[in-house]
UniProtKB/Swiss-Prot annotation:
This is Uncharacterized ORF4 protein. Pfam families: Allexi_40kDa. Residues 260-272 have a biased composition (Low complexity). InterPro entries: Allexi_40kDa (IPR008398).
Length: 380
């Protein structure tokens, strides 16, 4: 039977508090870095938002500039076409007038291409430079080697490039539209998904923390006490063994050699003034528990108790006897679970015949609250 004292209850309470503190420290060490990381992500998001707004303003300015450039380019191109068409009409009119005039007044002949092959190669090189994405334009079945066909083909190439620029511009405007900033596939939508995932992870960590705290608070205290009792029992056994070893070493190093029973009996026959034998008086009270007696390196177990105190199964009594011609000294120490209850030395002018029962009788005479019981009384 193991008696649980306040010492065990305090130890169990301290162990529970330490376990809860360890769990709290572990959870705190996991939550604090995640909170710091979330704060850095929020700062990054704010910086990205500021940069995005600035970029949107810049892109809006660029879009306005591109629109103005497109309008100006179209206007200049139309002006160039009109200017090119006017000389052609004038040349046809002059040619028609030359045919109508008499032979003496012929009009001057104009040269449109000094090198036709070079002009055609340059025109073909420009027509081969097309945008990455092709667009459907009206067909142009006009000969490129003619002036009007060449101008028409170049005009179609310019229209295709303007269509490509306009398409890219519309795509950029749609992507930067505030109504479509969080649409699927945009950088902000991907960033929003990452923040949502991080928030879910933080919620999971918080729920795990709450579960750990709940499981810690709902731990069965009886299991903890049972484990503490088993640990306490092992420590007691280890302490008993260490006490035996220490007492043996102390007796070997400090105790003077005590005469044996045979030597004492022979000395009594030769001693002119022998000590009278001690008449032991043993208590008759009932002992609630058992205790250990350590004498001369031998550990014995007998019924033992201390009245006026809670019953304890951890009582231990160490006894050493010193004999001389004048008296007999009994040194004893009474311990409870390693704590010293009583330590004293008793001298008597008697010779102890039955050890350790005579020693126990002397201790009981000194401390009446200490009681014991010998099972073998009356055998001899």
């Amino acid at each position: 039977m193991v008696i649980v004292t306040t010492f065990h209850i305090d130890a169990a309470r301290d162990r529970i508090i330490n376990c809860v503190k360890d769990v709290r420290n572990i959870v705190t060490n996991q939550v604090v870095p995640a909170t710091r990381k979330l704060g850095s992500i929020e700062t990054t998001l704010e910086n990205f938002r500021t940069e995005t707004i600035g970029g949107f303003t810049t892109i809006s300015d660029c879009v306005s500039l591109l629109r103005n450039l497109r309008s100006e380019t179209t206007r200049n191109f139309n002006t160039l076409l009109s200017r090119t068409a006017e000389p052609t009409g004038q040349a046809q009119t002059q040619l028609r007038q030359g045919f109508d005039e008499p032979d003496g007044h012929k009009s001057e002949q104009r040269t449109f291409f000094s090198n036709l092959d070079t002009a055609l190669n340059a025109t073909q090189a420009l027509l081969n430079h097309v945008p990455p994405a092709r667009y459907t334009l009206p067909p142009a079945p006009l000969p490129v080697n003619e002036s009007f066909g060449q101008l028409h083909a170049l005009h179609l190439n310019t229209l295709e490039w303007l269509t490509h620029i306009n398409h890219n511009l519309d795509s950029m405007l749609n992507m930067l539209n505030p109504a479509n900033l969080m649409s699927q596939g945009t950088p902000l939508s991907r960033l929003k998904d990452a923040v949502r995932t991080l928030t879910q992870n933080m919620n999971t960590i918080q729920s795990d923390q709450q579960k750990i705290l709940a499981s810690t608070s709902a731990t069965n205290h009886s299991d903890i006490l049972r484990k503490l009792e088993s640990l306490d029992t092992g420590l007691k056994q280890l302490g008993i063994r260490l006490d035996v070893v220490v007492s043996s070493l102390n007796n070997m190093s400090e105790r003077p050699p005590t005469p044996s029973h045979d030597t004492a009996s022979s000395s009594t026959s030769t001693d002119p003034n022998p000590l009278p034998p001690y008449q032991a008086v043993h208590p008759s009270l009932f002992c609630r528990t058992y205790g250990n007696i350590l004498y001369n390196g031998i550990d014995s177990r007998i019924p033992m108790d201390v009245t006026g105190r809670p019953a304890s199964t951890s009582l231990k009594l160490t006894i050493t006897v010193e004999c001389s011609e004048q008296n007999t000294r009994v040194n004893f120490t009474l311990l409870d679970d390693g704590y010293i209850l009583l330590s004293d030395s008793i001298e008597t002018k008697h010779k102890l015949q039955h050890i350790p029962s005579d020693c126990l009788s002397l201790i009981h005479a000194r401390c009446p609250k200490f009681v014991y019981k010998f099972r073998g009384e009356g055998l001899c």
